[in-house]
């Protein structure tokens, strides 16, 4: 009997559920997002995230911002890029004890050429690392940026 208990304990301790440090979700506007505010130049929507932690998406003047988790003020502080941009749809949630503490999201930045025109070859990609709001600390903010085109190991850098 003890052999079974030891084997089961070893199996559970080494299973992915105990060692998992990240997981992924998608922002799905058609199926898991609800628009909570509309205005002339944009929207704010709440989308399904990781196991009850919502994703708050905002767009204004062709610039996007995403916040994560339980936050008390949806539009308390705008954090985006000066250039037109769009957020990707895949979120990497960084987990500790199965609870998210950070989220990583790729943004696409519409950089211009020297004449001020948008050119696809100048498009930037930035991995944005944000905190995840909890009931105890209901705020989410950007804590890091990694230039995904300038760094070969951008994803590894964003996870540090």
Residue map of PLM features:
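Mature extracytoplasmic domains of secretory-pathway proteins
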Residues: 68-123
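Short acidic, glycine/tyrosine-flanked loop/strand segments centered on an H-E-D-like triad
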Residues: 122-147
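Charge-rich, low-complexity N-terminal segments
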Residues: 2, 16-82
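Sec-dependent N-terminal signal peptides
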Residues: 5-14
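Generic hydrophobic, helix-prone segments enriched in Leu/Val/Ile
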Residues: 54-57, 91, 130
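A mature extracytoplasmic/lumenal domain signature
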Residues: 107-109, 132, 150
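C-terminal partner/receptor-binding element of secreted or periplasmic proteins
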Residues: 141-160
């Amino acid at each position: 009997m003890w052999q079974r208990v030891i084997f089961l304990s070893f199996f559970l301790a080494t299973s992915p559920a105990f060692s998992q440090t990240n997981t992924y979700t998608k922002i799905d506007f058609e199926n898991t997002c609800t628009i909570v505010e509309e205005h002339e130049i944009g929207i704010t929507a709440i989308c399904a995230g990781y196991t009850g932690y919502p994703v708050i998406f905002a767009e204004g003047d062709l610039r996007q911002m995403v916040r994560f988790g339980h936050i008390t003020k949806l539009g308390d502080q705008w954090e985006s890029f000066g250039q037109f941009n769009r957020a990707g749809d895949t979120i990497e949630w960084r987990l500790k004890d199965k609870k998210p503490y950070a989220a990583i999201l790729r943004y696409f930045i519409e950089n211009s050429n020297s004449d001020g025109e948008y050119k696809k070859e100048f498009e930037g990609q930035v991995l944005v690392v944000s905190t995840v709001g909890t009931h105890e600390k209901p705020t989410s903010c950007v804590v890091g940026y990694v230039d995904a085109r300038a760094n070969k190991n951008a994803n590894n850098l964003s996870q540090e």
